Regions:
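A short, polar/charged loop-to-alpha-helix boundary motif
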Residues: 68-77, 357-364
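Bacterial N-terminal signal peptides
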Residues: 5-15
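The feature captures the short pre-catalytic strand/loop hairpin that immediately precedes
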Residues: 160-172, 238-253
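Active-site helix/loop module of the DD-peptidase/beta-lactamase fold
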Residues: 32, 48, 78, 83-87, ...
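Mid-domain, small-residue-enriched loop/turn segments at the edges of structured enzyme/sensor domains
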Residues: 130, 184-185
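Active/ligand-binding-proximal structured segments within catalytic/core domains
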Residues: 92
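Catalytic nucleophile serine of serine hydrolases
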Residues: 86-87, 180-183
Length: 469
């Protein structure tokens, strides 16, 4: 419909509106986020997605769209398990910082101090890799252990094989000079955790992080016994013909501290709420609040001044807002974990397909919902007769119509920037609305036809009908 309806300008997230128009409620924004996510997933041909958004200590919404396993029609839900891959690194870094706070190590320690078998020489002009170097991906280490585990059957090496092969690997760069994302580095950080804790890495993480935070659906390794049950079936990126291929299930074995975990959006929502709770606390049984703030703070800035990294938290600024978090990408799975610490808003998005950007999905949900998190519910007319999706063929996919304040709003789909396509509609007559321009003036008319059940069957805009889907 966007090619038919003349738009004066793209709207910013919540453009100025006339005094007659009430601001949207949080419930209305959540409904738009849910409808948009469902539509965008379908247009991107992603089998299934799950998402959650939290504000401080409240889960505003969590749910799923599509299918966790299309072969059995098992739906994706907020409790569907996905590989979260590199989000695993956050748990590893928390474990390292717990041991640091106990005086068992320092971030400036060279790896060889705690791992006697670590023999990689320093690159010319650099120093030996340190803990802070691996936790900020600035140690100059290779990206991977020297095995081809990201292709073929995803045959990840055991820790014994990683240690054996490490002896023949070399640093890529001098330490502290370049940002070089390294799964090998975080794998070694996990080995330090095990060495200093005196117990297996997974046991330490369960006892010190997962159990205290009641993360009952988070696993340090993909649980194979959940295949066909709660675990989503992973799919490849799309091929040229638009198809996706189901991928074999894997366990990351020795790479688990860097990429092994599986979780649900509901559990990572708990992880987000703990961080918001921790941030304002004087003490915390899992991690000193001062330490969490230290982890958020950038510890390495790349020479391009575009890449900032905390203690394994990525940190970035978008439109004046500072975000922290991490992404995850394993064969058949993508995850985004994004936090706005100041507003205490967190978004988690998981998908069972490669070749997509879950971070963009998370940011779109954030943009829709965050401006409304403090908006109280107000009495508004029942406009449910008009809400839904209307077919914009052949010019577009569809137009989503939702209640918005005391009127309606439309969003065109597909789009990865739903708030930039949002148009507000004001009721001006029986089943009749007009578009509200940025300056509050009224534009074209939207006339809804009502069927026998009292629901709209189509909407007329610029003398053209668009049927309800």
């Amino acid at each position: 419909m966007r090619a038919i309806v003349l738009t004066l300008t793209f709207l910013l997230s919540f453009a100025a509106f006339a005094a007659d128009d009430k601001p949207p409620t949080n419930a209305q924004a959540l409904e738009l986020a849910r409808r948009w996510l469902d539509a965008q997933r379908a247009y991107d041909e992603i089998p299934g997605m799950s998402a959650a958004i939290v504000h401080d200590q409240k889960v505003l919404w969590s749910g799923g769209t599509g299918q966790a396993d299309p072969t059995t029609n098992r739906p994706a839900t907020a409790d569907t398990l996905y590989s979260i891959c590199s989000v695993s690194k956050l748990f590893t870094s928390v474990a390292v910082m717990q041991l640091r706070d106990e005086g068992k190590l320092t971030l400036d320690d060279p790896l060889s101090k705690h791992l006697p078998w670590y023999k990689l020489p320093a690159a010319e002009g650099g120093r030996e890799a340190t803990l802070v170097g691996v936790l900020t991906h600035s140690a100059g280490l290779p990206r991977e252990s020297d095995f081809p585990y990201w292709t073929g059957e995803f045959d990840f090496p055991t820790r014994e094989k990683i240690i054996e092969r490490l002896a023949s690997q070399q640093p890529l760069y001098p330490s502290d000079r370049y940002f070089q994302y390294s799964n090998l580095g975080l794998t070694l950080a996990g080995e330090v955790v095990s060495a200093k804790a005196g117990k297996p890495y997974d046991q330490f993480v369960r006892e010190r992080i997962l159990q205290p935070l009641s993360l009952t659906s988070t696993y340090p390794e993909v649980p194979l016994d959940e295949k066909g049950k709660r675990l989503a079936q992973g799919y490849s990126a799309k091929r040229r013909d638009g198809t996706r291929t189901p991928l074999p299930l894997f366990q990351t074995r020795g790479i688990a501290p860097a990429a092994g975990f599986a979780s649900t959006v509901n559990d990572l929502a708990k992880f987000a709420m703990w961080q918001f709770r921790n941030r304002d606390a004087k003490s915390d049984p899992v991690l000193d609040p001062r330490t969490l703030r230290e982890m958020y703070r950038p510890h390495f800035v790349d020479a391009d001044f575009e890449t900032y990294w905390g203690v394994d938290f990525a940190t970035w600024k978008d439109g004046g807002t500072v975000f922290v978090g991490h992404g995850g990408s394993c064969p058949g799975y993508r995850t985004a974990f994004q936090l706005d610490p100041e507003k205490k808003v967190g978004v988690v998005v998981m998908a069972n397909a490669s070749g997509i950007n879950t971070g963009r999905f998370a940011k779109a949900i954030y943009d829709i919902v965050t401006p409304t998190v403090k908006n109280e519910a107000t009495t508004a007319p029942d406009l449910s007769a008009y809400t839904g999706s209307y077919d914009a063929f052949p010019w577009d996919g569809e137009t989503i119509v939702v209640a918005w304040g005391d009127g309606l709003a439309t969003v065109d789909a597909p789009t990865m920037e739903p708030m930039r396509t949002l148009e507000r509609l004001r009721k001006t007559g029986e089943h009749e609305f007009r578009r509200v321009l940025k300056d509050g003036s009224l534009g074209e008319t939207y006339k809804f036809e009502i069927g026998p059940d009292g629901k709209a069957t189509r909407v007329w805009v610029h003398s053209n009908p668009y049927p309800r889907m």
